[in-house]
Amino acid sequence: MAKKKADRRRAPAAESQDKHPPVRLKIRRQDAPDKPETRRWETFEVEYLPRMNVISALQQIQKHPVTVAGVEVAPVVWDCSCLEEVCGACSMLINGRVRQACSALVDVISPKGKPIVLEPLRKFPLVRDLMVDRSRLFESLKRIRAWIEIDGTHPQGPGPRQSQEQQEELYPLSRCMSCGCCLEACPQYGPHSDFVGAAVISQVRLFNAHPTGALQKSERLEAIMGPGGIADCGKAQNCVEVCPLGIPLVDSIQTVAGETSRRFILSWLLGWSSDGG
């Protein structure tokens, strides 16, 4: 008798799950960057699963790439790796907003079975379908020397210690995953501009604040004062609104802007060269 009551208690939940409509995805596709004539929209339906995200839906399409019209097509191409909002690879436009596909839950972005619209990022060169090439971002990080130089021919011993306050201030900056969301939302960034963007500026702040990284502070400031650097920021503050990790990008821009202003004034007063001081 007790078992029958338990079965009756579970029945409504199972019934409500069965009634959940399939998840419909409308995807912007293109076969190759040099084939704009292949640009098109294709719509798919996949089975709803509890707590599924957009990546889960794309994986279902990959296994069974058939549109709602019953046409079998090539599997949709997208980029991903960690599936836990760490690698930054799965950035795309979801319902018109740039975000990470791995953290976009269907229950949140598709209430009552509303179609989910997926598009590739527009500020980066297209590879295929939802996959883009973020090489420009990585080249910008090289330009500002976004690393700590510790290599050498002999052991250099332990590095300098940081206070707890320094660690708490810098840790949020270190979480940047180079996903490109801030660059996609920035009106100053794109093919029309050389602007490096908020993510790169924030890394200047991070590495200049590190006791060992500060040894290359002058080089980083000179790089970010050059073409496409801090002066090209339009102060729109879209970057901080879309950052999936809540990194204080506007604070970083303000900090680096102050440092570059001081360096410019000192170089003018003291006659420093671009590689000195």
Each predicted region: which residue ranges?
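Ferredoxin-type iron-sulfur electron-transfer modules in oxidoreductases and energy-metabolism complexes
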Residues: 52-74, 105-106, 114-277
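Short, contiguous acidic and Ser/Thr-rich linear segments
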Residues: 39-53
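Short structural boundary motif marking the start of a folded domain
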Residues: 19-25
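Short polar catalytic/cofactor-binding loops
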Residues: 27-33
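Short, Gly/Pro- and small/polar-rich lid/capping loops
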Residues: 2-16
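Beta-strand-dominated extracellular/periplasmic modules and repeats
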Residues: 24, 41, 64-66
